Amino acid sequence: MRLVANTKSAKKRILIIRKRTMRNKAIRSAVKTAIKKFEMALKVKPAEEARELLRQAVRALDKAVTKGVIHKNTASRKKSRLTRKFNSVYKAS
């Protein structure tokens, strides 16, 4: 691991940033996975399973907001869109 920084504090900041970047990527990936699972469930699963996966996706989004990975308005927009998708599929039928 080669650090370009000169000062001790700058080297430490680089290490901290790398650690946080890895954590943020993991959280963001978990959010994307939860959303994809929900969207797949809309196509093939019954309403109860899709509703549970919607809850999990919303929970993942809320956790990401709590950790500071995504902005609260972004999460709110995504939750709204997922809920609208759910309602359009299951309320119409």
Curated annotation (Swiss-Prot):
Family matches, as PANTHER family: 30S RIBOSOMAL PROTEIN S20, SMALL RIBOSOMAL SUBUNIT PROTEIN BS20C
Keyword RNA-binding: yes
InterPro entries, per database record: Ribosomal_bS20, Ribosomal_bS20_sf
Function noted in UniProt: Binds directly to 16S ribosomal RNA.
UniProt GO MF annotations: small ribosomal subunit rRNA binding; structural constituent of ribosome
Biased composition (Basic residues): 74-84
Highest classification ranks of the organism: Bacteria, Bacillati, Bacillota, Clostridia, Thermoanaerobacterales
Gene name as annotated: rpsT
Protein name stated in the entry: Small ribosomal subunit protein bS20
Keyword flag Ribosomal protein: yes
